[in-house]
């Protein structure tokens, strides 16, 4: 009877795991036992800020600004790539939003302005080269003229020598006279209206600001405010394009006039060279005659 009575020690132990876990481990250190008695961070009240939510008071804003700037740059580069690609990777132009189309219009306007400015720069370089070429042509014409003047001086010296050769000989010798097929007239080209004067006149007018559009530098426009919309930015780019095209038209007109001057200068030089060639041939013929006369006199 007494053997069948259940003792409290034999009762089912439902909380044996909890009791075992609550017993201190003899192998645990004092620090670990103290940490077990501290509060669990997950059981803190919501009013207490967690360490993960705390931000650095000195560097938090800088990090956020850096993230925002990098994100803006990535968005800008992505949009610029889409603009260059004409939205081929995103469904085409017809499937874009109004904001994307406005940015696309501004991008195209800026690219057109850059193209116009590039053409203007090329035209200015061509004008500089044309100016130097025109001056070189003028110097070449001056050299031809000086050479022809030297031929005239040779003609005068040769005429005096021919007179001396004609007076030499004996009393009974035949009088010698040189044969002249044509007179030596000298340079025919007049250089009153030289290309250098026209070039210098053009440069002086440009420095004084008297030309209609001196290289596009006379026009200055106020920059747009940061709050300007896409329409205002496009209109600003269109105004820049108009100015650039006007300057380009003026430079092309100057290049046309320079080309005409070059053509007329080359034509004058060709005529001058023809006259110089004829005079040199005449001088060469007369020199040969004088040499023959001298050899005959020495042979006697």
From Swiss-Prot:
Keyword tags: Cell cycle, Cell division, Coiled coil, Membrane, Phosphoprotein, Protein transport, Transport
Segments forming domain t-SNARE coiled-coil homology: 235-297
Major location (coarse): membrane
GO BP term (any one): membrane fusion
Keyword Transport in annotation: yes
Skewed-composition ranges (Polar residues): 38-49
Phosphoserine carried by residues: 29
Segments of this protein annotated with the region Disordered: 1-76, 176-228
GO function terms (MF aspect): SNAP receptor activity
Tissue: Ubiquitous, with a strong expression in root tips, ovules, very young leaves, vascular tissue, hydathodes, stipules and the abscission and dehiscence zones of the siliques.
Gene3D superfamilies in the cross-refs: 1.20.5.110
Entry GO CC: cell plate; plasma membrane; SNARE complex
Basic and acidic residues: bias regions: 190-208
Subcellular location: Membrane
PROSITE patterns in UniProt: T_SNARE (PS50192)
Stimuli inducing this protein: Locally and systemically induced by pathogen infection and locally only by mechanical stresses.
Annotated family: Belongs to the SNAP-25 family.
Role of this protein: t-SNARE involved in diverse vesicle trafficking and membrane fusion processes, including cell plate formation. May function in the secretory pathway.
Subunit-level organization: Interacts with the cytokinesis-specific syntaxin KNOLLE and with SYP121. Binds to EXO70B2.
Name under which the protein is recorded: SNAP25 homologous protein SNAP33
Species of origin: Arabidopsis thaliana
Gene that encodes the chain: SNAP33
